[in-house]
């Protein structure tokens, strides 16, 4: 099923890219465990990594710091590798309230979560691809370090069907039930099966648009075929097929029985400890809750909150790391940590927050001590599990630099010839009036301005002041969610307004080629928002414009300012020298504004077929770009119901049309999530 990685791009590596690709590949072939790619904004870091993957033909996991950036990377990788398995693995919760107890008010908060089934399907598709194929790129968020079903148990539970095999129909149905598939002869949807005589139709949990038909002759599998679950049209006949479990957390019956005995032993030991400490209420609470879970597991094979018993179900010892997505990555896999200066500290912080909450639950009798082993990886465990790693950032952190031994692969020269912004330092006393005059100059030539302040109050006051003086200005603050933030950036690029004011505008990921000026107020106030890395990231926001300029307002030059200015000048000098040697004139980027929400596949608007009676239900332009993930999901559910209705009425053309629209809505949903 695997194919070789085949890179699809109209461009050839240029600028610093060929040298960066060569050095990274040499390092990987020499067995270097850690390498750092220092790639400036707009230098084509993703393209460089795609070339490395294609040349070395190794399965790869790309870690991104948030869902927005993960969606963007997923789209870019899908464009680079249209014929290979590019997968998406992020948290499938639209909403998640973990189980918690507040001793001060004696308040227990039940776990409450809303699972998004489309992302769940993509997660299952990702692990399936990692187990079956070599040509796989999985773009993941920090969700990858959280506990997942054990791959060994997951593989044991798979159902293999081949043409000619002897198997009883009841045995197939029993195995499907063990895989947590449900029988539904009326509504055929993902994770269900239906039976019609000697024909079993199965809709695999990881599939979006293909189902399996198993035709039996007595106790022999006579034919296996793949078909479109919507139209019933046969796509192809196949010699064999493997059905994967409906969830990552499925466990064989014998393992559950063994786990139940181990849970009983731990419960007895914990009860003894609680009674010795005169904690009668806690002992009663723990006994009641655990006995209920054991009865559920005995009857159904699972229970609510079964992840708290994951240590017993996976057969691991106390304190051992939980199975995660890293266990599915082959031994020769490659890990790429994007925006590593943000992602690495995130990985380090996940374990501690989770531990503090669970210790309270254990202490007050809501959970057994083994629940502490249902956790994300500790940082040391992540380091031990990580394969050969490439850290990618414009401002690598101390950790990455230390691990790479100071040998950093530079990617400073942009293929477009664009230079890093010119930097000026101006006094604080006149910063607001000076800024106003700069804004007017830029607005007159249809260019945009970003302004970053130190406090929320100052950002609000500055926005008000600029509005009073007739400037078109918006203020970006922490209460704005991802979708609205993307909408504001889109409006800035379209010229709905000229100035965007914020406190922390160095958010990695989305780029704005129209921005020609970045103004940093109070740049001489040393601290988190004015550190060397923050300054370089913020200055980089103007690096995609030919007239890029950054003004730092400060009465003195701090060590962070000096380092940021020095690094920017070093890059600019190298870029200028390269341009002169190769006769390159810097070219501005004409990136389409719609690209902000693009996810790799250009979904063509569905055209009416036949006699032109049918028309698309959801044209792209009719979908508000600021729809929340919840609203998008509701729209998707409505259309799915309508699609099934058309299919039942044998109106397959209309149903197929809605299906195409659903593809587009799901792409939008991933971006919004």
Curated annotation (Swiss-Prot):
Full protein name: UvrABC system protein B
SMART domains per the UniProt record, alphabetical: DEXDc (SM00487), HELICc (SM00490)
InterPro entries assigned to the protein according to its UniProt record, in alphabetical order: Helicase/UvrB_N, Helicase_ATP-bd, Helicase_C-like, P-loop_NTPase, UVR_dom, UVR_dom_sf, UvrB, UvrB_inter
Compartments reported by the entry: Cytoplasm
GO molecular function, one term: ATP hydrolysis activity
Domain Helicase C-terminal: 431-597
Transmembrane segments annotated in the record for this chain: none
SUPFAM superfamilies the record matches: C-terminal UvrC-binding domain of UvrB, P-loop containing nucleoside triphosphate hydrolases
Residue ranges of the region described as Disordered: 608-627
Name of the gene: uvrB
Family: Belongs to the UvrB family.
Motif (Beta-hairpin): 92-115
Main location: cytoplasm
Highest taxon, organism lineage: Bacteria
Complex formation: Forms a heterotetramer with UvrA during the search for lesions. Interacts with UvrC in an incision complex.
Residue span, Helicase ATP-binding domain: 26-183
Record-level GO cellular component terms: cytoplasm; excinuclease repair complex
HAMAP family: UvrB
GO biological process: nucleotide-excision repair; SOS response
UVR domain mapped to chain residues: 633-668
């Amino acid at each position: 099923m695997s194919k070789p990685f085949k890179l699809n791009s109209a461009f050839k590596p240029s600028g610093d890219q060929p040298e960066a690709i060569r050095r990274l590949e040499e390092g990987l072939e020499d067995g270097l465990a850690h390498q750092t790619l220092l790639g400036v904004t707009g230098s084509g870091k993703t393209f460089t990594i795609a070339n490395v993957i294609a040349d070395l033909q190794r399965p790869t996991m790309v870690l991104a710091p948030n869902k927005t950036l993960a969606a963007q990377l997923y789209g870019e990788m899908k464009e680079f590798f249209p014929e290979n398995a590019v997968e998406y693995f992020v948290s499938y919760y639209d909403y998640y309230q973990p189980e918690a107890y507040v001793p001060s008010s004696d308040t227990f908060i039940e776990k409450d979560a809303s699972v998004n089934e489309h992302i769940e399907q993509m997660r299952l598709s990702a692990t399936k691809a990692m187990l079956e194929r070599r040509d796989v790129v999985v773009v993941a968020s920090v969700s990858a370090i959280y506990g997942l079903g054990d791959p060994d148990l997951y593989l044991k539970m798979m159902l293999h069907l081949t043409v000619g095999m002897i198997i009883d129909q009841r045995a197939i149905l029993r195995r499907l039930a063990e895989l947590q598939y449900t029988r539904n002869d009326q509504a055929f949807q993902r994770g269900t099966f239906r039976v019609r005589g000697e024909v079993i139709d199965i809709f695999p949990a990881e599939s979006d648009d293909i189902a399996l038909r198993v035709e039996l002759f007595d106790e022999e599998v006579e034919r296996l075929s793949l078909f479109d679950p919507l139209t019933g049209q046969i796509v192809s006949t196949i010699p064999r097929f493997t059905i994967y479990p409906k969830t990552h957390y499925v466990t064989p019956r014998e393992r559950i029985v063994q786990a139940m005995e181990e849970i009983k032993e731990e419960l007895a030991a914990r009860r003894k400890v609680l009674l010795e400490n005169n904690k009668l209420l806690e002992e009663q609470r723990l006994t009641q809750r655990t006995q209920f879970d054991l009865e559920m597991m005995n009857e159904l094979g699972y229970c609510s909150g079964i992840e708290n018993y994951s240590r017993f179900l996976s057969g691991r010892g106390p304190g051992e790391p939980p199975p995660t997505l890293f266990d599915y990555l082959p031994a020769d896999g490659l890990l790429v940590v994007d925006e590593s200066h943000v992602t690495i500290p995130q990985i380090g912080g996940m374990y501690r927050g989770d531990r503090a909450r669970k210790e309270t639950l254990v202490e007050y009798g809501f959970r057994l001590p083994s629940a502490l082993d249902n956790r994300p990886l500790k940082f040391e465990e992540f380091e031990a599990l990580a394969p050969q790693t490439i850290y990618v950032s414009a401002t690598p952190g101390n950790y990455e630099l230390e691990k790479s031994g100071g040998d950093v692969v530079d990617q400073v020269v942009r293929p477009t010839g664009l230079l890093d912004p010119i930097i000026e330092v101006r006094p604080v006393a006149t910063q607001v009036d000076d800024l106003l005059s700069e804004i007017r100059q830029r607005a007159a030539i249809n260019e945009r301005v970003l302004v970053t302040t130190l406090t929320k109050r100052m950002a609000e006051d500055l926005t008000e002041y600029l509005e009073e003086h007739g400037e078109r200005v918006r203020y970006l603050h922490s209460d704005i969610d991802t979708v609205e933030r993307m909408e504001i950036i889109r409006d800035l690029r379209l010229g709905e307004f000229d100035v965007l004011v914020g406190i922390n505008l160095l958010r990695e990921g989305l780029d704005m080629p129209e921005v020609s000026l970045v103004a940093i107020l109070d740049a001489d106030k040393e601290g988190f928002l004015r550190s060397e890395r923050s300054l370089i990231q913020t200055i980089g926001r103007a690096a995609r414009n030919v007239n890029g300029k950054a003004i730092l307002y400060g009465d003195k030059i701090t060590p962070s300012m000096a380092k940021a200015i020095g690094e920017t000048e070093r890059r600019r000098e190298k870029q200028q020298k390269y341009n002169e040697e190769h006769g390159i004139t810097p070219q501005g980027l004409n990136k389409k504004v719609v690209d902000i929400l693009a996810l790799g596949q250009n979904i063509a608007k569905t055209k009416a077929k036949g006699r032109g009676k049918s028309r698309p239900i959801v044209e792209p332009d009719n979908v508000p770009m600021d729809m929340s993930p919840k609203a998008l999901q509701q729209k998707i559910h409505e259309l799915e119901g309508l699609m099934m209705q058309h299919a039942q009425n044998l109106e397959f053309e209309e149903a197929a049309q809605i299906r195409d629209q659903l593809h587009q809505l799901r792409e939008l949903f991933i971006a919004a999530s």
